[in-house]
Amino acid sequence: LQLYMHEGGYCRNKHVGDYLDYFKKAEQVAKDIMDLQYYELQAEFKDIWSPQNQHNNEIIFALPSFPIPVMGNNFLAHVLPTDYKSQQGIPLTGWNGFRTPWEVYDSFDPADKRRQVHKTEYWNGKEMVTGRTGTLEYGALPMKYQENANTDGTNDASEYVIYRYADVIMLRAEAKNEIFGPDGGGTPTAKELLHQV
C-alpha cells in the first residue's frame, strides 16, 4: 500500500508516468484487506496499545517484545521523567525524553481520543507533578504504551505496533481522494472512509 502511494505521489510530483495507476493499485489492495472482514478498529483508541489487549484485530503488523535488553519495547523509558514513580508499584526507568508539545496537545479537541494516551500530570513518589513547568515544560507525556508489569524496568513486553487497520482505511481514503476527489468513486467515498477513523 505505502509503496503504491509513494510511487503515485512521486510520479504526480515529477510529472512522469500515469500516477493514477499507482493510486488505483493502492485503493484496490486496501479494499481487498477491508473485504477480508478480519481486521477492525478497536472501540477504545487507548486499548490498541494496552498490554492486556495485545494481538487485537486492529493490529496488522507488530514487533513482538520481551522484557530484556535489545528485545524489549523501551518507548515508555524514553517518555517517562526521571522522577516518575508508578502508582501500581512497577519499577520503571525514565529518561525524560519524548514529549508531545503543548501547542500540539492543545490543538486536539477536548473530546479527541488522542488525549486519552497523554498524561498531563504524574506521580513522583511524593506528590502529583502538574502544570506546564519543570519536567512538563515542553509537553504532555505521550503514553500510548502504558505501564506493563512484564518489564525489567526499561524494556517491557508490549508489542511495538507498526501497522494498523486504521492505516489501511486512511490510505484507501487518500487513494480514493487522489483518483475521484473527496466525494466521488462510489461508496465508501474518501470522506466516508476518513470519518470511520
Task: Map each language-model feature to its residues.
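Short coil/turn linking the two alpha-helices of tandem helical-hairpin repeats
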Residues: H6-H15, E178-P182
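Elongated scaffold/linker segments in the mid-to-C-terminal portions of large proteins
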Residues: Q28-D35, Y39-I179
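Generic hydrophobic alpha-helical scaffold/packing signal
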Residues: E174, K191-L194
